[in-house]
Amino acid sequence: MEKRIVCLAGDGVGPEVMESAKEVLHMVERLYGHHFHLQDEYFGGVAIDLTGQPLPQRTLAACLASDAVLLGAVGGPRWDSAKERPEKGLLALRKGLGVFANVRPVTVESATAHLSPLKNADEIDFVVVRELTGGIYFSYPKERTEEVATDTLTYHRHEIERIVSYAFQLANKRKKKVTSIDKANVLESSKLWRTVTEEVALRYPNVEVEHILVDAAAMELIRNPGRFDVIVTENLFGDILSDEASVLAGSLGMLPSASHAEKGPSLYEPIHGSAPDIAGKNKANPIAMMRSVAMMLGQSFGLTREGYAIEEAVSAVLKSGKCTADIGGTETTTSFTKAVIQEMEEQALVGRGR
């Protein structure tokens, strides 16, 4: 298989974890006979420094012409007072790609379960599906005076149906349960959300559906996260709940994410930030970036075997006791990456020997 991947290393630790992603992809090429064209482009703060814009037209054009986009990290205090903010580039990139579904799998490795704030954390295995295009972030009018500020929350039926349908399709491949989170006891948009969800559910009779109010859901994520399989919710609720869910893994350096469009390339990135305090120190945890690569291989390219090989190698290295400082170890970004690559090669040799 031959695919073009645009690599947006970005800021902070982004270039370091992107290098780990590239090394993993090179090993996949070698082990499975694929070829990936890796195209580097400027994005975020580094793009502001060079071009004055966080998302140069050249970068967006390259992304649109690609088969998938990998993003390292964006932002940092260096640009806090800048006229253009790096984070604006991420919103513009999402809009330019037309992505509507942000997907965050939340799992906990048995080797690092003790780092989770919860007991029995190794039983956690769910996915948060967040709608990205509608809701209070993108609805108008938005107004502010000295005395009054107004935001508008609008959702169209087609936006709800599109994201909920995606969630049901995903659940149909997993444990066959969808939890829709809303505030239907108060908000008109949530009442429509619940109605459309029930209509979509009729098309998936083998998938269980439940509705939970967002305040109760925030509590259940901590009290009983094992009840969830696929969570689907609107933009604001998803923004908050996905961040809450991310702490269950014990470190932000562990979890990947994907943002999908109806057509065209998807965007894959670790959920952690740019971590400017450790940038350039070879301390960043590359696991979330590696898992983002695994998601890309499986979800965009249909290379499930190759994606699984990365996941298995990461798990094996963690079980061996090797880990970076954020999860209690002494490995560097490069040494942990090297260990994963060696494990991939060893597992491939064992598999062929059988």
Curated annotation (Swiss-Prot):
Example of a GO cellular component annotation carried by this entry:
cytosol
SMART domains found in the cross-reference section: Iso_dh (SM01329)
GO MF terms listed in the record are:
3-isopropylmalate dehydrogenase activity; magnesium ion binding; NAD binding
Residues binding NAD(+) are: 76-87, 273-285
Keywords, in A-Z order: Amino-acid biosynthesis, Branched-chain amino acid biosynthesis, Cytoplasm, Leucine biosynthesis, Magnesium, Manganese, Metal-binding, NAD, Oxidoreductase
Tell me the InterPro entries matching this sequence: IsoCit/isopropylmalate_DH_CS, IsoPropMal-DH-like_dom, Isopropylmalate_DH
Catalytic activity reads: (2R,3S)-3-isopropylmalate + NAD(+) = 4-methyl-2-oxopentanoate + CO2 + NADH
**Entry's EC annotation:** 1.1.1.85
Instruction: Give the highest taxon in the source lineage.
Output: Bacteria
Q: Where in the cell is it found?
A: Cytoplasm
Kindly list the positions annotated as binding Mg(2+): 215, 239, 243
Which GO terms fall under biological process for this protein?
L-leucine biosynthetic process
Q: Which residues bind substrate?
A: 94, 104, 130, 215
Which pathway features in its UniProt record?
Amino-acid biosynthesis; L-leucine biosynthesis; L-leucine from 3-methyl-2-oxobutanoate: step 3/4
Site positions (Important for catalysis) = 137, 183
Q: Which cofactor does it need?
A: Mg(2+); Mn(2+)
Instruction: Relay the cofactor remark from the entry.
Output: Binds 1 Mg(2+) or Mn(2+) ion per subunit.
Q: What does this protein do?
A: Catalyzes the oxidation of 3-carboxy-2-hydroxy-4-methylpentanoate (3-isopropylmalate) to 3-carboxy-4-methyl-2-oxopentanoate. The product decarboxylates to 4-methyl-2 oxopentanoate.
Which family, according to UniProt? Belongs to the isocitrate and isopropylmalate dehydrogenases family. LeuB type 1 subfamily.
Q: How does it assemble?
A: Homodimer.
- Name this polypeptide is given: 3-isopropylmalate dehydrogenase
Q: What broad taxonomic lineage does this protein's source fall under?
A: Bacteria, Bacillati, Bacillota, Bacilli, Bacillales
